[in-house]
Amino acid sequence: MRADAPQPDVICAMAIAARGAGRVLARSTTETRNKALMAAADALRASQSELLVANARDVAAFTGAAAFRDRLTLNPERVEAMAKGLEQVASLPDPVGHVMAEWDRPNGLRIRRVATPVGVIGMIYESRPNVGADAAALCIKSGNAVILRGGSDSLSSARVIHAAMQAGLKAAGLPVECVQIPPDADRAHVASMLGAAGLIDLIIPRGGKSLVERVCAEARVPVLAHAEGLCHTYVHAAADLEMARRIVLNAKLRRPGICGATETLLVDQAIAPKILPGLIEDLATRGCTFRADARARDIVPDLPAATEDDFATEWLDAILSVGVVDGVEDALAHIARYGSAHTEAIVTEDEVAATTFLNGTDSAVVMWNASTQFCDGGEFGFGAEIGIATGRFHARGPVGLEQLTTYRYEVIGTGQVRL
């Protein structure tokens, strides 16, 4: 083993320390956890100069695409936004101890289901420094210890942010092991986290398709994840044309690179000749390009032809796949074939059609007369989010504080024994 290789038990030791620290955190008061977050926000502001210098080193060494460089880059405004994000999480209701349900049995037993922390969370993410701050804040508030493994591109930035989070914990009298990062960027740490069954309770990956697919394939720990955000907007025959125009422009172009951006536009054949030419022109003048099926090209002939793979592609760019469909059921069949179970939207004034679409779409989030870009923890009122989940168990959609809890049953008796 080379001298600078990570020791095999680094993640194991961190997880054991996190387990002990997490027990203290889980039993702490709301006020104590809020104090930690407010103090961490102050520490982040105080370390702004150090953080920007560290971030400049990360950016200077970065060799990837411009869009990823922008996500990596910090400035004073983004540092302040991170600090305000910590304060916002502190202001949110505490999910720990919330009585989710309560009932009495005929024998006099009172049973209640109470929200509790998950335990130790492993967060694996790519090069966005703010993700580490958001994840740490949500885990602290929900009583979970967390191990943050960010991308190697942002390691210098992550260390300064981590120091600020630990300063906040220390100021509140909480164990600093509640928030930890590996000592270096060695990829072996990812494999160790994925194999840490019994030590880490939940893995949350946040990043590109290849990262998420690797985590889901190799993890021996439960995972909350989404591999792609292949979102659809369906313009129904009974859509308000101006509303549809506004929604489609926003859903595609507000921020094309986020997972809630619409990647495929489906237009009902009954309305396509009326709306499609003008809508394509509006999108094109804003820099959008297209991949269209044969029926869409019959209406707008100069559109580039779509391949089968195009409708299964998450573009993350100002590119839109366009198809014409024969009503709600045809739209649902297209989404079932190509979608990623993330977010779908219908634009219509027909309540029956909307209800059919809402009930027939097997995705984490389904919208009626709204942009798919509203799939966001902040927009849902969750405060910050730690990611989006498209699986079928524990949590679906934006993952906020409530989704970072599990529950226990408390049974209160007056001396009952079972016959």
Regions found by a protein language model. Give the residues of each.
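Substrate-binding/gating loop at the entrance of the active-site cleft, primarily
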Residues: 102-146, 151-161
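Short beta-strand-to-turn element immediately C-terminal to the catalytic PLP-Schiff-base lysine
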Residues: 234-238, 265-269, 324-325, 347-349, ...
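N-terminal Rossmann-like NAD(P)+-binding subdomain of aldehyde/semialdehyde dehydrogenases
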Residues: 1-111, 138
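C-terminal segments
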Residues: 3, 8-15, 322, 349-419
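Solvent-exposed alpha-helices and their adjacent loops that cap or buttress functional pockets
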Residues: 102-103, 111-117, 139-140, 171-175, ...
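ALDH superfamily catalytic-core signature
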Residues: 8-9, 46, 126-145, 160, ...
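NAD(P)-dependent aldehyde/semialdehyde dehydrogenase
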Residues: 269-371
